[in-house]
Design a protein with these regions (language model features):
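S-adenosylmethionine/decaboxylated-SAM
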Residues: 3-19, 25-225
Length: 225
């Protein structure tokens, strides 16, 4: 078994609309490949499915070897603050003119269908806090790449970080320890609290991606310390 992206899916990932650099996507794929045999993975922040292809590729490989891997990906598909009209990361082609709001769900659906990953990647459409409040399943891998404001980042940490199983991995995107490189909330509201809780230790870092391993506690119980 190789642990790099299968060439056909790498092509889809590179072509997909979104915000996942190829090297960080490969890292995401590697951690998903390690973890998916042990339980479902969950991503917060689907957008148009770019990172979901890296995760789904790992699921396809695990399932080809007899596994039953699945990746859930949560998004209300209305965009983050920085995706709205007038902001830096706005794309007018993902606006639904009828409702006058962003809607990345159709693009996501086309992207995942074209990649052939509809069986592996399951979209959960809704607010992260709402889905988290009703979530009950331990995760082999959690990937947070959702809203980058202070409150959304804090909510994502509180809602999801405790669902990682012991030995499981927690990947966080857009972590910028140096404020000159980017916004602070994923660093201050997710990355640091995860380490300070004592439940996580850092195992990998690449670009703005950080990968932590759960070293103590029980999935679903509040994070200690
Ligand atoms: N992982 C994607 C990029 C995600 S961009 C990629 O690889 O390209 C961040 C996404 O988080 C946006 O699509 C936005 O709609 C979503 N988001 C922001 N805040 C959210 C919230 N509170 N609940 C659900 N989704 C949210
Ligand atoms: Mg990101």
């Amino acid at each position: 078994m190789t642990d790099t992206m299968p060439p056909d899916l790498l092509e889809h990932a590179l072509a997909a609309k979104g915000f996942m650099p190829p090297d960080e996507g490969e890292l995401l794929h590697r951690v998903a490949r390690e973890r998916l045999p042990h339980g479902p993975a969950l991503e917060v922040g689907t957008y148009c499915g770019k990172s979901a292809i890296y995760l789904g590729a790992a699921a396809r490989q695990v399932n080809a070897a007899g596994g039953s891997a699945v990746v859930f990906t949560v998004d209300h598909h209305r965009g983050s603050e920085e995706n709205q009209a007038g902001w830096e990361h706005h794309d007018p082609t993902v606006v639904d003119p009828e409702v006058g709001m962003m809607d990345t769900l159709p693009t996501f659906r086309r992207t995942i269908a074209a990649a052939g990953l509809e069986d592996q990647v399951v979209a959960v459409v809704g607010r992260s806090t709402t889905v988290a409040a009703h979530w009950r399943t331990p995760l082999s891998l959690l990937f947070i790449d959702g809203g980058h404001g202070e409150q959304p980042a804090r909510d994502d940490f509180r809602g999801w970080a405790h669902w990682v199983m012991p030995g499981g991995l927690f990947a966080i995107h857009d972590v910028f320890p140096d404020p000159a490189d980017g916004g602070r909330p994923p660093y201050e509201q997710i990355y640091l609290p995860a380490l300070e809780s004592g439940a996580y230790e850092e195992v990998d870092a690449l670009g703005s991606m950080r990968v932590l391993r759960r070293v103590s506690g029980t999935a679903g119980d509040p994070l200690g310390g």
